[in-house]
Each structure stands twice: as structure tokens, then as C-alpha cells.
Amino acid sequence: MAESTATTTAVPPPAEESWNADSEDVHQFYWTYTEEPHKSRRAAILKAHPEIASLNGYEPLTKWIVLGVVSLQFTCAYLLSQSSLLSWKFFLTAYFIGAFCNQNLFLAIHELSHNLGFKKTLYNRAYCLFANLPVGAPFAASFRPYHMEHHAYQGVDGMDTDLPTRAELILFDNVLGKAFFCTFQLLFYAFRPLVVRRLPFTLMHFWNIIVQFSFDYLVVRYVGWRALAYFFMSSFLAGSLHPTAGHFLSEHYNMTRTRLIASGPGKETPLETFSYYGPLNFFVYNAGYHIEHHDFPYVAWTRIGKVRELAPEFYDNIPDCKSWCGIIYQFITDSNVGMWCRVKRKQKHADIPTKSMHLHVS
């Protein structure tokens, strides 16, 4: 069960006006005063299906998959250590093998951040550092606290760093801008938190940096700089115009703008979390089951599909993403959707932590 401890202070709502359904300019975020939806959904689902609580827990298989993926990436890096970065062999391997592998590791770190790889928290933290190695840059230590806040404060402006900023909305409000965002999407997820909400530097960050840069040095020293370049290219492509990168958009972007307009202020709050049930889940620990994950964040990937099976009445009527490739294409080319298709919350009576949240799972 999650517990949080933090120093709090009341924070006023954002200065922006609430979204107006009658406004001629619909290119703005949808603001709502409602709480994030998954807490109440979880209570309702457990009331109807208490057996779902038994699905909570870690999955031992995860560590072996991570070991295999890390080994595969190191093998590819070694085999490409004498190849030109500009060769088709290098690029195609990075795109069709490396990007799938590193996206797998991104989502493995996501599972481990929820303590779903091992029974003990320390083992999950340590294995995050191992899974981080082929990514090239240290990110596992930073990901966890930001991601825990994303769950606890979904949609809260200034707290949920998954949300685009006003500057991003303005800069990427056309086809070229959205194409640029999708191409370099991983960089926005990496640097946006530094602008929106900086969290304290911890011992975990220190070890993440030491372990990662030591590994990078050893790779360059004994295998060659091209091997390290392969790791970085794999990570870049995984967060760029790649099929698995569609999950970044499918999770919380409401791609049917008319659904927002039809449920303006004073009406039903629009949907803000979506799932994808397609075959690419095979590569990413069923990360497409995103509504289910937010409803039950401590159910491991091998059992998350069971949530929907046990409580179909809570999921079958919610629109789902049919294609991760398709949603990237739609996001870029459709003038009716864009950075603004996100729900943001104004919590007038909520206390927001001024420091990092410390979440513990028992």
C-alpha cells in the first residue's frame, strides 16, 4: 500500500482560465477541478470484484527477461563496434533490434519502480541500475520519484511532469512542430522535469550516475565508442518515430477532440487515460494496459490483463487505442489534435507537497 510523507503548502490554481467550450480557440488544455479518476475507480472496482486485490505482487520472470535483453544489446553493440554509424547495418540494427530492446528496458524500469520485479525494494532499485546500462544515460533514479508523483497527482499542473507545458503547446501547434516533438520526444521527457519540478538529488541518483558512467567508460575503453553510440542511438530511436513510442501518446492524450468539446465545464469530465491491447504489448511488459495500470499500479505485467477480464464492465465501454503507429501519424497530421489534448487539474482545496514525495510500498 502506498504511503506518502511530505511538507505541504497550499498552492493556488494556475492563472489560466478554465477551458470554455464556446471558445473559438480550442487549442488549449482542458482544465478541471475533479480529482484524478483512478482512486474512485479503484474503490468501485474492488467493491464489485474484491478478488482483484489478490493480483497485486511482483513477477519473478521480469529479471530474467531484463537479463536477456541487456545481453542481446551488449552482443549487438559488440558486433557493431567496427561498423560505421552511417551504415545501413548500424541504423537498421539500432531501429529494429536496439529500439525495441531499449523500449523494453524503459518499461522494465517502470515495472521495477513499482517494486514489481522483486519482493524487496532494495533489489528492485539495484536492478534498475542494471536495466539502465544499455540506455547509455542514467535515468532510472530520476524516473521513479517523478513517476510516483504522476500516479498520485495525475494531471495536476506543476506536479505531473508527464504533462506538456504551455510553451510546448505554443511551439508545437502545427504539423512541423508536432513532428519535431514526436521525433525528439524522449528529450522532452528527460528535460521537462528540470523546468517544471526539480526533485532533490538522492543517494540513488549518485549510484545511478556512478554505475552508468563507469559502464560507459568500460564500453568505450574495451569495445569502442561505436558500441556506446549504438546504445544511445537505440534509446533515441525508441523514443522517436518508432512503433513502440506510440505508448507515450496513447496513454493520456485524448485524440478525439470532439469528446472534449462535448463534455465541457459543468459536464462530465473527459477521458484522460487510455489503453492499447495490440500485439506490441509483447515487447513492453503489457504497458498498453494503461487504464488498468493506473487503477491497480501494483499488479505486475503478467497479471494486469486479468484485471480487465475480471471487471469487463469497467473497461469495455472505454475507447482504446487501436494502433501505436496510427496514433503517432494522427497526432502529427490531424489539426484537431495536439499538445493541448490533455486534462489538467486545478485543485483549489488540495495541499501540494513542496518537496519530493516519498512513497513506500508494503
From Swiss-Prot:
<feature type="transmembrane region" description="Helical">
    <location>
        <begin position="169"/>
        <end position="189"/>
    </location>
</feature>
<feature type="short sequence motif" description="Histidine box-3">
    <location>
        <begin position="290"/>
        <end position="294"/>
    </location>
</feature>
<dbReference type="InterPro" id="IPR013866">
    <property type="entry name" value="Sphingolipid_d4-desaturase_N"/>
</dbReference>
<keyword id="KW-1133">Transmembrane helix</keyword>
<feature type="region of interest" description="Disordered">
    <location>
        <begin position="1"/>
        <end position="20"/>
    </location>
</feature>
<feature type="transmembrane region" description="Helical">
    <location>
        <begin position="90"/>
        <end position="110"/>
    </location>
</feature>
<dbReference type="GO" id="GO:0046512">
    <property type="term" value="P:sphingosine biosynthetic process"/>
</dbReference>
<dbReference type="GO" id="GO:0042284">
    <property type="term" value="F:sphingolipid delta-4 desaturase activity"/>
</dbReference>
<dbReference type="GO" id="GO:0046513">
    <property type="term" value="P:ceramide biosynthetic process"/>
</dbReference>
<dbReference type="Pfam" id="PF08557">
    <property type="entry name" value="Lipid_DES"/>
</dbReference>
<feature type="transmembrane region" description="Helical">
    <location>
        <begin position="200"/>
        <end position="220"/>
    </location>
</feature>
<feature type="short sequence motif" description="Histidine box-2">
    <location>
        <begin position="147"/>
        <end position="151"/>
    </location>
</feature>
<keyword id="KW-0746">Sphingolipid metabolism</keyword>
<dbReference type="GO" id="GO:0030148">
    <property type="term" value="P:sphingolipid biosynthetic process"/>
</dbReference>
<keyword id="KW-0560">Oxidoreductase</keyword>
<feature type="transmembrane region" description="Helical">
    <location>
        <begin position="60"/>
        <end position="80"/>
    </location>
</feature>
<dbReference type="Pfam" id="PF00487">
    <property type="entry name" value="FA_desaturase"/>
</dbReference>
<comment type="pathway">
    <text>Lipid metabolism; sphingolipid metabolism.</text>
</comment>
<keyword id="KW-0472">Membrane</keyword>
<feature type="compositionally biased region" description="Low complexity">
    <location>
        <begin position="1"/>
        <end position="10"/>
    </location>
</feature>
<keyword id="KW-0443">Lipid metabolism</keyword>
<feature type="short sequence motif" description="Histidine box-1">
    <location>
        <begin position="110"/>
        <end position="114"/>
    </location>
</feature>
<comment type="function">
    <text>Delta(4)-fatty-acid desaturase which introduces a double bond at the 4-position in the long-chain base (LCB) of ceramides. Required for sphingosine biosynthesis.</text>
</comment>
<protein>
    <recommendedName>
        <fullName>Sphingolipid delta(4)-desaturase</fullName>
        <ecNumber>1.14.19.17</ecNumber>
    </recommendedName>
</protein>
<feature type="transmembrane region" description="Helical">
    <location>
        <begin position="121"/>
        <end position="143"/>
    </location>
</feature>
<dbReference type="GO" id="GO:0005783">
    <property type="term" value="C:endoplasmic reticulum"/>
</dbReference>
<dbReference type="GO" id="GO:0016020">
    <property type="term" value="C:membrane"/>
</dbReference>
<dbReference type="InterPro" id="IPR011388">
    <property type="entry name" value="DES1/DES2"/>
</dbReference>
<keyword id="KW-0812">Transmembrane</keyword>
<dbReference type="InterPro" id="IPR005804">
    <property type="entry name" value="FA_desaturase_dom"/>
</dbReference>
<feature type="transmembrane region" description="Helical">
    <location>
        <begin position="228"/>
        <end position="248"/>
    </location>
</feature>
<comment type="similarity">
    <text>Belongs to the fatty acid desaturase type 1 family. DEGS subfamily.</text>
</comment>
